[in-house]
């Protein structure tokens, strides 16, 4: 029986996320990696996003990657167009290692 123990603090889910970015015109992929805690906002406005895409078809805040204890989900923001593995998604989507995400003209390949 513990009586004087401090309350247990719940830590936020976090994990390494690696994305390989390529554009329609680009030949090579660009590697982007970060230790993501809780969420990652993707968009075209560097002041509002964690990952900024220089893409005229990307909204200032386009989508959010959410890290949860049981995986990673992707959610479009404000009905923005997002595709995963060639199919449009209309809401929250559970991502798998190797999934391909299309935002505007930019393709992102996910490595977990």
Residue ranges of model-derived segments:
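Eukaryotic mixed-charge, acidic/polar low-complexity intrinsically disordered regions
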Residues: 89-99
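Short strand-turn-strand beta-turns centered on an Asx-Gly dipeptide
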Residues: 84-86, 104
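Amphipathic hydrophobic-ligand
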Residues: 58-60
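Intrinsically disordered, low-complexity acidic Ser/Thr-rich regulatory segments
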Residues: 1-56, 66-68, 95, 102, ...
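Short, solvent-exposed loop/turn segments at secondary-structure junctions
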Residues: 49, 82-83
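Short, basic/aromatic beta-hairpin or loop at an interaction surface
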Residues: 71-82
């Amino acid at each position: 029986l513990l009586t004087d123990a401090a309350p247990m603090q719940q830590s936020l889910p976090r994990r390494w996320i690696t994305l390989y970015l390529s554009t329609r015109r680009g030949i090579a992929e660009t590697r982007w990696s970060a230790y993501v805690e809780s969420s990652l906002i993707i968009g075209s406005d560097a002041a509002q996003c964690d990952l900024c895409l220089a893409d005229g078809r990307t909204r200032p805040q386009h989508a959010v990657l959410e890290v949860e204890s049981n995986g990673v989900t992707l959610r479009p923001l404000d009905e923005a167009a997002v595709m995963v593995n060639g199919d449009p998604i209309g809401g929250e989507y559970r991502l798998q290692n190797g999934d391909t995400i299309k935002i505007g003209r930019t393709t992102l390949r996910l490595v977990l």
